Amino acid sequence: MAVLKMTDLDLKGKRVLLREDLNVPLKDGKVTSDKRIRAALPSIEMALKAGARVLLVSHLGRPTEGEFDPAFSLAPVAEHLSRALGFQVPLVRDYIDGIEVAEGQCVLCENVRFLKGEKKDDEALGRKLAALCDIFVMDAFGAAHRAQASTHAAVRFAKVACAGPLLAAELDALSRALDAPAKPMVGIIGGSKVSTKLTLLDTLSKKVDRLIVGGGIANNFIKAAGHEVGRSLYEPELVDEAARLMAAARAAGGEIPVPVDVVVGPEFADSAPATVRKVSEVKPDEMILDIGPETAKLYRDILMQAGTIVWNGPVGAFEVEQFGQGTKALCMAVADSPAFSLAGGGDTVAAIEKYGVVDRISYMSTGGGAFLEFLEGKTLPAVAVLEERSSKG
């Protein structure tokens, strides 16, 4: 993707606005997961090392727009950043009409969603944000699918607009996996409902050589293959769609393999006993909650031969130990595979972390909705405007 990158520019003495995704979970005024802060740190440190005057901008939660609400303040993030960087990062509440930042200093601007017009991609607000800096750096991949004032309008009106290191790395990884993938290409799509990932399943089934489905999504395909699913979560109105996707994949020379065995339980509960059954032997009062060991072996064989793996969603209810063995086996297979592996989505990342293979996945995306929309083939507004700005020079 042809976008100007922060690494292409001389930042010394320049006012550099870094739009990051610091939308972290909070409890009792404390950050409970600093994953997004850690992901942004290299970009911040790079800008500071280059002698920039750094302004950080981010949203947090969903406050009422145009109103200050201490429950959605970035104050806990400023504290966390100060500890991580080793110096005080002041939180500035009134910044929209201009702010003085010294060379080598970093300030955090208060929640951009407190500003009226942010969500509507307001042009006037975009111009004001753009006027705060000499260089606008869009680095928030997690918000790149939203056309908002701080991710879109400001990019349009900034003197210079570019992609930050984190966004650039995301785009490089996604392009490598989707634009010119090493073959065979394997997709793994899990989750509870086909309806939420129908576009993704449709897009990937035409692109990949094999499409592994898991979780509640797989139950629709099991049903479409003529097997009973008992009391399992599935969507009866989408069984025909699952059959169509399997037929379309076959017609294109690919495959959506159906599990040969599954792990069932009487209910989805921590105390529920787990039983392995052939997929053709699921009883009416049972729920499918994981793939079985034979299926895990088949999927491992597929993944070990892959050139590219794109993964979104677990294949079982891995939050309950006895229904997590399939997802664990899949994690190990992706980690062991020589393929370029790209994973994204909250549950997928949680599984990768739980089973200790973070360092063995080629790239883990920081985006949720943005990752899915990119995989679906949709244009991300923040990326599109960066490409437009770059093409005009």
Swiss-Prot record:
ATP binds at residues 197, 319, 345-348. It is found in: Cytoplasm. It catalyses: (2R)-3-phosphoglycerate + ATP = (2R)-3-phospho-glyceroyl phosphate + ADP. Pfam families: PGK (PF00162). PROSITE patterns: PGLYCERATE_KINASE (PS00111). GO terms for cellular component: cytosol. InterPro entries: Phosphoglycerate_kinase (IPR001576), Phosphoglycerate_kinase_CS (IPR015911), Phosphoglycerate_kinase_N (IPR015824), Phosphoglycerate_kinase_sf (IPR036043). It is an enzyme of class 2 (transferase). SUPFAM superfamilies: Phosphoglycerate kinase. Pathway: Carbohydrate degradation; glycolysis; pyruvate from D-glyceraldehyde 3-phosphate: step 2/5. This is Phosphoglycerate kinase. It comes from Nitratidesulfovibrio vulgaris (strain DSM 19637 / Miyazaki F). The gene is pgk.
